[in-house]
A protein has these predicted regions:
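Mid-domain alpha/beta scaffold segments of enzyme catalytic cores
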Residues: 1-300
Length: 300
């Protein structure tokens, strides 16, 4: 058996030519969430410091489980450049509805104390949307990879509610869409208003879906060699609809795939997009930052 490949925290990349924003990440709300690799666990503030040094000067951190709402808002209040997206994650929505059947991937979900009835959880989201640190509703949507059939109805109910509350609050909506493209698009067509700012976070659709006119946020997977469909989607998207994100601590871009992810590592994804666009790094950064401002406004 070959020795296990080391998966350290990525080195800090060279600074970008212009500042950018991580449109979707998950900052650790508790120290125990930070992975330790080769004896190193980068603290929240060290992750943010590295991000600033490479030019990722602001970020939107998604809290999509009830216990994380207030800690994430507190983090944003105390740290320059950090803003928050709030929602009940689709997999959480099923648990709030009491659906804990084994999922298609073989895992059995665990209902916890914080899984209050779904209507109470949704009310907790809406009650916090007026906080000045909250700039988006998200991530909400559908996830058929991790949820069995009974839970999918709860996901649909939750998704509709999030679309409506984002519209009422005049906030953009970050969408989680995993193996559920058709139903996600159907519900958007049914519930979303014509001028809603809709962002498909960690975009996973194809070129045809990219032509529908919503924002698409690309994460590390666009750098993976097998993901030609993602690159085809980027090629047909108007550049003013393209955003960039990490979805950290997941989906680390090449050349650090498999290692822990954080906002500072997004520089690799930005440079990859610049190459695909065949523009200078500075031009790509300026375009991505302008797109972010069009969706969320500016706080940096």
């Amino acid at each position: 058996m070959s020795p296990r490949k080391p998966r350290p925290w990525p080195d800090t990349p060279a600074p970008l030519s212009a500042p950018v924003v991580d449109n979707h990440t998950h900052l650790p709300t508790h120290a125990g969430e930070i992975p330790r690799r080769e004896g190193v666990a980068l603290s929240l503030d060290e992750q943010l410091d590295r991000a600033r040094k490479v030019g990722v000067t602001a970020l939107v951190s998604s809290a999509c489980e009830l216990p994380d709402f207030d800690p994430m808002i507190d983090i944003a209040r105390a740290r320059e450049g950090v803003r928050v997206a709030l929602a009940i994650h689709p997999n959480e929505a099923a648990l709030h509805a009491g659906c804990a059947e084994p999922s298609p991937d073989g895992l059995t979900p665990r209902v916890c104390e914080h899984h209050v009835p779904l209507d109470e959880a949704l009310a907790a989201v809406e009650a916090r949307l007026g906080d000045p640190t909250v700039v988006a509703v998200g991530e909400s949507g559908l996830d058929y990879f991790r949820t069995a059939e009974p839970g999918r109805q709860a996901q649909k109910e939750s998704f509709r509610a999030h679309i409506e509350m984002a519209d009422r609050a005049d906030l953009p909506l970050q969408i989680h869409d995993r193996e559920a493209h058709d139903d996600t698009l159907a519900i958007l067509g049914e519930c979303a208003s014509a001028d809603q700012r809709i962002v498909f976070h960690c975009y996973s659709g194809d070129a045809a879906m990219a032509e529908r006119g919503w924002y698409a946020s690309f994460a590390g997977p666009i750098t993976y060699p097998a993901n030609e469909e993602l690159r085809a989607a980027l090629a047909v998207l108007p550049r003013e609809l393209v955003l960039v994100e990490t979805d950290a601590p997941y989906l680390t871009p090449v050349p650090w795939r498999g290692c822990p992810n954080a906002s500072y590592v997004m520089a690799h994804t930005v440079r990859f997009i610049a190459q695909l666009w065949d523009v200078s790094e500075a031009a790509a950064c300026d375009q991505l930052r302008a797109n972010t401002q069009a969706v969320y406004g500016s706080w940096w």
